[in-house]
Amino acid sequence: MRATVCLPTYNEKENLEPMLRALGEVLVPGDRVLVVDDSSPDGTGEIADRLASELPFVDVLHRPLKEGLGPAYLAGFWRALADGAELVLEMDCDFSHRPEDTRRLIDAAAGADVVLGSRYAPGGRIGNWGLVRRIISRGGCLYAQALLGLRLRDLTGGFKCYRREVLERIDLDAIHSRGYAFQIETTYRALRAGFRVVEIPITFVDREVGGSKMSRSIVLEAIWKVPALRLAALRGQLR
């Protein structure tokens, strides 16, 4: 099945070229990488354009504003669907997600509708995170599990693979999450729609180049968004 990897970028000039070249080593003919750049002031968008002219599997989508992870992914999803992708992947550009693991997610999609690259599934692990970041991540997953009644272990991770049918069925226009709540919301909507979601273990390593995008507003959004999703589901308003 033809896959498109959506790669959102904001100030990733050091990481973009090595990431794209690494993905080129593991993707197969017909697969694409879509760089979704939010007008990075460091010139990431220009680097993406140069690489798209050199690497035949790379496309670039320029967005005029930095609006957050969720809107960037949604724009990428619509573009990938319009271009005929059968599988659509999310991953980070900073090497937190290993390029070679994209193949594992794609292969796992043969038996599932959504595949989560899981830090907390048996065999998964996290490298070089401090205690506070580990607590925030694990606590966020447990919080979402409890309120939404889910057994999946990693609900906030951003390494995912969707079958085309999932993105066509869930109401993408109703998704307004900007930060990591986006990951919880898309998975929850897929489950509510009856799709099969599985986890495969990955090794997650924090970025070595560039700055983290984590912020207080991202955490606060997830805190209120999770109960809002549960309430919408109880009212029959979630698709």
What are the residue ranges of the model-derived segments?
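Hydrophobic helical membrane-anchoring modules
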Residues: M1, G149-L150, L172-R239
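Short, well-formed alpha-helical segments that are part of the catalytic scaffolds
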Residues: E12-V26
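Acidic helix N-cap motif at the loop->helix transition within catalytic regions
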Residues: E14-P18, D42-L51
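Residue-level signature of catalytic and energy-coupling elements of molecular machines
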Residues: L23, G76, D94, R163, ...
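A conserved acidic beta->alpha catalytic loop
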Residues: D37-E46, F95
